[in-house]
A protein has these predicted regions:
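Catalytic cores of carbohydrate-active enzymes across secretory and cytosolic contexts
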Residues: 1-790
């Protein structure tokens, strides 16, 4: 059974304040400042001591305090106003409701983690935070989206450093009854290695978006089955496979049990990739062949890859796959060897099942998360399309964004509301140009308040008189992976020490982040940072903040003047932490990688010279460290400390304004979700509707014989075949620009040369996904001619 943390039963909230319970259970409060202020006003001390958790706050308020609050007309009025704002947020028409001709009905968004609030610790890092921001922006825009994830009984680990500076992990158990979620009546079962595993479902409400979390810690399951959803990214490869079966296959079954029929299934990375197999199984069970089922599934499938390195992709051995899918392959209408072929590559000789390869083959649309990452992904997966030029590999790119209301601090938000407009999140370029009219003194005062709060936070966490509230403050916070090079500054320690101890122009650094428990090199980096920070002469200006989470991140984004990012290019897929800092007025200093590669304009921050053409890793690191120190010494420090007669750094403030103007319209999650909706979701929904219309004809017969999936006889005249197929191809190009030329990918789709077709160099893959050859090229040519005439 689940270990339960101590949780106090919430006393009866007075009737006059009854909406507080609803407000606490809908995570819309996490980005509604006025609702947060309402909760704080109930008891400021308790709000702080309970970690800004409304449920814990309501549980801790005494009956006497409740009576006093119920008699306070200001509190009652604020509660009713917050309730009205929530109702408006979940019911009022938004951007999507204005798209009256949109074919989109519902998107199912799958992710292994969701970072919505530190009060719901179901995330580890960038992927989860991005997923949380995606849900929030979808709610703000009114996009019809339902999310699916796993409920981890112990979440992700809490971090502490021992006497030697070494990271240690602890996993305090969570009680779902103490979290902002509700039970549901839904329970589904899934066969895993011969055991029928029961899966319960919890519902989290994120504005108007429901998030369903799957839980195997259920009475009646074996201890092994109950432990499947124990920890995020815990356990070995086999444990990961079991989790991904629950997420992908179990997730689809949960949606069906809830009566939901999404048109579009969005898979984030390969973790949920098995959802496509479950959808294929459903269609095969209804009478489709495997190839027909693949076409139907692909029509509504969207796959987003988040890693630029093969090592970041889940791959499972044939033996492990045999153990878990050996008896299930027949339900997909194929043999086990056929099933393995879906996730295999000719250039991977170990025969492992690659989740990203399967994701790409079974999704009709795919994208990276930045323009450079899209290029890297096309190169990394080009082997799946050996006859297609790399530039035409069908993997696009939608650059990530961040949910501005979640991450912008209380000191900066009023400035943006005054200069950009009350609805500044997602505003256009013309609106953002208004930041240039802000009073420099007002801007600098807001920046100083954020920095002072960071200093106060650090001192409360670590003690002592650490940091200087007036010194140039540089932040570095992210997962400690080797390619992110957190210790790059330590490669030239004397130069670093000179920066830290400058009596007139001091610089201070704040580091935070976790290393995966199995990543020893990442742990070593944390140890090296911590040991340097413990040196008496520099420890007051160089610190490591342990137990990094969303609360720590917010304080750092609000308080740092410069955000540092120095990965090895091009290994950073996107890297959204710099976006959050930028919205708070921080200036980025980064390698031109991820989002910064496309957003740096020469004036909105600094670019570290990259030596990615140097094959010697050690020499490359030294060259890039030298470039970084040069920027700090010759540009960043002088600009920050160049003060006018009024004591203000006008050059720095001007750079902040340009930073907002150039980045504000682009780096928000509102822009990102709009792009996903118009460029991926709506075209996929149109394709899914077309496939559904075809499905209705699947069982039809006429006097001549059974019809194929386009509603035509099995051996029709050539023109009778080509015309409907051409029309189908055109309809899948774009829901907005149907008159544009049909790209190569759509020809392949229309001709039955599936996404995997060009990779079909083995006999098995040719049989599963036919395509290629002179006959196919002739058919393609005829189709092209017909489309041009149409």
């Amino acid at each position: 059974m689940r270990a339960v943390r101590e949780f106090n039963v919430v006393p009866a909230v007075p009737a006059a304040l009854a909406p507080l319970s609803e407000l606490a259970f809908n995570l819309h409060w996490t980005w509604d400042r006025e609702t947060q202020q309402l909760f704080e006003s109930l008891d400021p001390g308790l709000w702080k001591s309970t970690g800004r958790d409304p449920l814990r706050l309501l549980a801790a308020i005494s009956a006497a305090r409740w009576a006093a609050l119920a008699g306070n007309p200001d509190i009652v009025s604020a509660t009713n106003a917050a309730s009205e704002r929530l109702r408006d947020a979940v019911e009022a028409p938004r951007w999507f409701q204005g798209r009256r001709d949109s074919p989109l009905g519902l998107v199912a968004y799958f992710s292994p983690e969701f970072g919505i609030s530190e009060t719901l610790p179901q995330y580890s890092g960038g992927l989860g935070i991005l997923a949380g921001d995606h849900l929030k922006a979808a709610s703000d825009l009114g996009v019809p989206l339902t999310a699916v994830g796993l409920l981890y009984a112990e979440g992700y680990f809490r971090q502490r450093l021992n006497a030697d500076g070494v990271q240690e992990e602890r996993y305090p158990p969570l009680d779902p009854l103490g979290l902002a979620m509700h039970t549901t009546d839904v329970q589904v079962t899934l066969e895993i290695a011969g055991e029928q595993v029961r899966i319960n479902v919890w519902k989290v409400q994120v504005g108007r978006v429901p998030l369903y979390l799957l839980d195997t810690n259920v009475e009646g399951n074996s201890p092994e089955a109950a432990a499947i959803t124990n920890r995020l990214y815990g356990g070995d490869t086999e444990h990961r496979l079991r989790q991904e079966m629950v997420l992908g296959i179990g997730g689809v079954r949960v949606l069906r049990a809830l009566g939901l029929q999404p048109q579009v299934f969005h898979t984030n990375e390969g973790h949920a990739g098995f959802l496509s197999l479950e959808r294929i199984r459903e269609l095969v069970a209804s009478g489709f062949t495997f190839r027909e089922a693949v076409e139907s599934v692909r029509a509504g499938g969207v796959f987003t890859t988040h890693t630029p390195v093969p090592a970041g992709i889940d791959r499972f051995s044939p033996e492990l796959m045999k153990k878990y899918f050996g008896t299930l392959a027949a339900s997909y209408g194929v043999t086990f060897d056929d099933l393995m072929a879906i996730g295999s590559r000719d250039d991977e000789k170990d025969g492992k099942f690659n989740m990203a390869v399967m994701g790409l083959r079974l999704a009709g649309r795919a994208n990276g998360v930045a323009q450079l990452h899209g290029e890297v992904s096309r190169e990394m997966f080009a082997g799946l399309w050996p006859n297609v030029p790399q530039a035409e590999v069908p993997i696009g790119a939608i650059t990530n964004g961040v949910h501005a209301p979640t991450w912008v601090g209380d000191h900066i938000a009023p400035l943006l509301a005054k200069s950009v407009g009350p609805v500044w999140d997602g505003a256009d370029e013309a609106s953002w140009s208004g930041v240039g009219k802000l009073d420099p003194a007002e801007v600098w005062a807001a920046r100083a308040k954020g920095r002072a709060e960071l200093v106060t936070f650090v001192r409360a966490r670590l003690g002592d008189a650490l940091l200087d509230p007036k010194a140039l403050t540089i932040g570095f916070a992210r997962r400690f992976a080797t390619y992110k090079r957190a210790t790059l500054l330590l490669s030239q320690p004397e130069r670093l020490r000179k920066l830290l101890l400058d009596p007139d122009r001091p610089v201070q650094f704040v580091f935070a982040g976790k290393a995966h428990p199995a990543d020893q090199p990442g742990k070593d980096m944390i140890r090296d940072i911590e040991l340097f920070a413990r040196q008496l002469d520099v420890g007051h200006r160089f610190i490591f903040l342990p137990d990094y989470d969303m609360a720590v991140a917010r304080v750092m984004y609000h308080g740092c003047d410069v955000w540092l990012n120095n990965p090895r290019r091009p290994l950073e897929a996107c890297g959204t932490s710099g976006m959050k800092a930028a919205l708070n007025g921080a200036l980025n200093c980064s390698i031109l990688d991820g989002w910064w590669d496309e957003c740096f304009d020469g004036e909105n921050g600094w670019a570290i010279n990259s030596a990615d053409d140097d094959p010697d890793t050690g020499r490359r690191d030294q060259r890039e460290a030298t470039s970084l120190f040069g920027l700090l010494e010759r540009e960043i420090m002088p600009l920050y400390y160049d003060r006018g007669n009024d004591g203000l750094p006008h050059g720095w403030i001007g750079k902040m304004a340009h930073n907002w103007k150039s980045l504000g319209p682009f780096i928000t999650a509102a822009r990102m979700v709009r792009d996903y909706t118009t460029d991926l979701y709506e075209p996929a929904a149109a394709g899914s509707r077309l496939a559904a219309a075809d499905d209705k004809q699947h069982q039809r017969r006429d006097p001549v014989g059974r019809l194929n999936r386009t509603g035509l006889r099995q051996r029709p005249r050539a023109r009778a075949v080509a015309r409907p197929v051409a029309q189908r191809a055109r309809s899948r190009c774009s829901s907005r620009h149907l008159d544009r030329p049909v790209p190569r990918r759509q020809f392949e789709l229309a001709l039955g040369n599936r996404l995997v077709g060009p990779d079909a160099r083995t006999r098995r893959r040719r049989r599963l996904f036919p395509g290629g050859g002179n006959a196919d090229r002739r058919r393609r040519y005829r189709l092209h001619a017909l489309i041009r005439r149409a």
